[in-house]
Amino acid sequence: NIAITYAYEPKQIAEEISLITEELQSRTVDITNMEQQGIDGNTDFNFNPVCVICDEIILMKLVFPDKLYKETLAKINAIIVSGRSKNIYAGLISQSGLAEYFGNSGIRGNIGLKVALGQMSASEYSMIFGTEYADVKNLRYGEIGSGLIMRTGLDSRPREFVAPYIKNHALD
């Protein structure tokens, strides 16, 4: 079963995030019950995957009422911090890596894949990849889809990344 929901109004987005947070809580209860029945906690519990993609997190901060933004961001943070073990994932897309758009900067340490496309400032690279990588540079700046990537558990530091470029007529 695959369900795709597209929400674009602040209230709709908040409702969808709330539903995913409820699913996260439900799976937490399910795991606790299974562990009490003697099922190993390191087992794959075969939960269907759930992915939430928050495109343009900056825009959320700008258009959401302040209280709704803070509540929604707290729920997104909860998904990022504890969702992976329950097969629930969050993707945050932003044109800026500045901390003011991501709330609690502690969530950045829990993000498993970080991609920075284009050329960013040293402070943005520092906020995305960590202070020890403030000096990294995208050497292919100007090339469409070029940037840096860092994958938790696979990369020891940001490395070059070029996203595939698909021309519109190639899809015809």
Question: Where on the chain are the PLM-derived regions?
Answer:
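P-loop NTPase catalytic phosphate-binding loop
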Residues: 1-33, 50-51, 57-129, 137-138, ...
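Alpha-helical multipass membrane-protein architecture
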Residues: 35-39
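Short basic/glycine-enriched coil/helix segment immediately N-terminal to the Walker B
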Residues: 41-50
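A generic structural signal for short, solvent-exposed coil/turn residues
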Residues: 44, 82, 141, 152-155
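Conserved P-loop NTPase motor module
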Residues: 75, 107-115, 143-172
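P-loop/Walker A phosphate-binding loop and immediately adjacent motor/lid segment at beta-alpha junctions
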Residues: 131-147
